[in-house]
Amino acid sequence: MKKLQLIIILFSLHSITFSQRKHQEISKKEGIKSIGMLKEFLSIPNDALNKEDISKNILWSTNKLNDFGFKTKLLTTSSLPLVVASKKINDKLPTIAFYMHLDGQSVDVSKWDQKSPWIPVVKKLESNKWIELDWNAIEDKENENIRIFARSSSDDKGPFIMLLTALNVLDIYNKEPAFNIKLILDFEEEKSSPGLPEAVAKYQTDLMADMLLILDGP
């Protein structure tokens, strides 16, 4: 009887380990596939002081969110607009709002060790120096300690793409989030969000949620 119990336990542990490994492999695969989307987004300049830059980022992000099944709305203010995107899973579920910003600070291009802050590159640290690699290096298992260099890669375009990638992984497993999703996208955070207080007062219904999480860097 004890031997049978031991066999069952060992089999269960093996099944759990195999399942975890499978999930990790799929997540990593989808993460690598999402790099193209991140690279495309990072290639759009997003200087918070440049309205033309911001307009292009608003257009790109809303189009992408629509592709992922979100309903988007532009919240106009006396400053630049915000975007609120909603994905309703079930009316009975709570709604979690995620605040993030997609603008970036102005840059001194001469201080960047690459052609442009808006031409993303892959680098690896070797002998205390960052060496630029080919983008295919991302798929090489031997190159796990590499970084993507571009303006706003971590603060804050990276988390935006990470969230969309996570939703894509859930779709692969035919799973749904356990809550309704609302995204609040600020395009002036790097200049103290002048339109945010006005939007909060003016669009209370659009911004209403049961919980708010701030995604400001991965």
List each model region and its residues.
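Bacterial Sec-dependent N-terminal signal peptides
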Residues: 1-22
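Intrinsically disordered and other compositionally biased segments
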Residues: 6-7, 50, 156
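Short, well-ordered loop/turn elements at secondary-structure boundaries
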Residues: 1, 92-93, 207-208
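Acidic/histidine-rich catalytic neighborhood of metal-dependent amide-processing enzymes
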Residues: 147-218
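Acidic/His- and Gly-rich active-site-bordering loop/insert found
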Residues: 20-149, 160, 170-179
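Basic side chains
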Residues: 2-3, 87, 151, 157
